[in-house]
């Protein structure tokens, strides 16, 4: 099997699985319980939170555990909207966002919120002048992802933050799902940040919203005690402990991993440039993600042709549906490219042998499936 869909999800690290199983067996108490077993679980959660905080350079009190990035994005957006709608009903975002950002914003329009989409340059980076222009006295939130999940565009979060911070009362949220575990991120540049552990070889079903300590938002889940007043529900002790382990492992030898992935990326791009395709990723894309468009073949047809050869890549993102990519359309203004896009996502587990096999099969499929 050749797995080239690491941005959709990653296989779980064996050490992470071992941690999860051990905690399931040895820590049976509800961390909200006052007896010894409950206190043991709570102590483990506190230790795990401190470990996560140390790795990310934040305070453990700033962590709100969620079921994943989608819930964290919803909590950030809906929590701010509910708390601060009296101050204003204007939110700014981009067309590059994950559906778990765009859909809650669309939902808020039903309640009178105005959503503005900042312009992008030809590389897919935020136009800072347009962002400045869009911010008004009614703006309460800007939500812009650190790394786009489809074509991997890395936004200049520091410059974006400077523009936003010139306006008192405007909060900055960033979906950092595609960069955590792959590159460093400065959490002090944003008020809130969302991520999912399944993207860095952790378990599915656990993620977090990192929220500035003194920022108050409304919860979207009510009833039931948890680690924070901002998200109800019994804390998932095994998932939290395994998340801490996965995050620590993800940042071990990060520079070495980044160097290896850069070499693989360049090797893959060189091979792809020789095929009858259009590459959508560019110099501002993270090295883990390579997006390209087929010229005369439907992406779904190619997806299943590759699957027959035990090769797995994506069309658009795993959490989105639709006939074309809004991300690529917003950058290229080319419906054909947006309708025929495919995403390869690699990791430090990917090998050159796998890439060679993928290129060999892709090349053969392009010749065989042309005009389908």
Language model regions located:
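Pyridoxal 5′-phosphate
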Residues: 1-372
């Amino acid at each position: 099997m050749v797995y080239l869909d690491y941005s959709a999800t990653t296989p779980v690290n064996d050490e992470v699985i071992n941690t999860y199983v051990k905690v399931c067996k040895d820590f049976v108490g509800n961390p909200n319980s006052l007896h010894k077993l409950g206190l043991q679980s709570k102590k483990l959660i506190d230790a795990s939170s401190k470990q996560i905080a140390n790795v990310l350079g934040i305070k453990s009190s700033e962590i709100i555990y969620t079921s994943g990035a989608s819930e964290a994005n919803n909590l950030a957006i809906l929590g701010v909207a509910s708390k601060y709608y009296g101050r204003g009903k204007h939110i700014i975002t981009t067309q590059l966002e994950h559906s778990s950002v765009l859909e809650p914003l669309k939902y808020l329009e039903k309640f009178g919120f105005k959503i503005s989409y900042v312009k992008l340059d030809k590389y897919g980076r935020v136009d800072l002048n347009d962002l400045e222009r869009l911010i008004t006295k009614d703006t309460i939130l800007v939500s812009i992802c650190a790394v786009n999940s489809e074509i991997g565009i890395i936004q200049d979060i520091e410059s974006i933050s400077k523009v936003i911070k010139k306006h008192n009362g405007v909060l900055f949220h960033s979906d950092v799902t595609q960069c955590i575990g792959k590159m460093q991120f400065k959490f002090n540049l944003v008020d809130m940040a969302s991520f999912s552990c399944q993207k860095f070889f952790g378990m599915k079903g656990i993620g977090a919203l990192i929220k500035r300590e003194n920022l108050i938002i409304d919860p979207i889940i009510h009833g039931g005690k948890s680690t924070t007043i901002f998200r109800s529900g019994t804390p998932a002790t095994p998932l939290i402990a395994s998340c801490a382990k996965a995050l620590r492992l993800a940042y071990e030898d990060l520079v070495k991993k980044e160097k290896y992935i850069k070499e693989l990326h360049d090797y893959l791009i060189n091979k792809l440039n020789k095929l009858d395709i259009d590459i959508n990723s560019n110099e501002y894309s993270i090295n883990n993600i390579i997006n390209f468009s087929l010229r005369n073949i439907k992406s779904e047809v190619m997806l299943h042709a590759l699957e027959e050869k035990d090769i797995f890549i994506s069309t658009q993102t795993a959490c989105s549906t639709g006939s074309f990519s809004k991300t690529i359309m917003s950058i290229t203004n080319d419906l054909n490219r947006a309708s025929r896009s495919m995403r390869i996502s690699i990791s430090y587990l990917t090998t050159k042998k796998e890439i060679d096999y993928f290129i060999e099969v892709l090349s053969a499929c392009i010749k065989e499936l042309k005009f389908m």
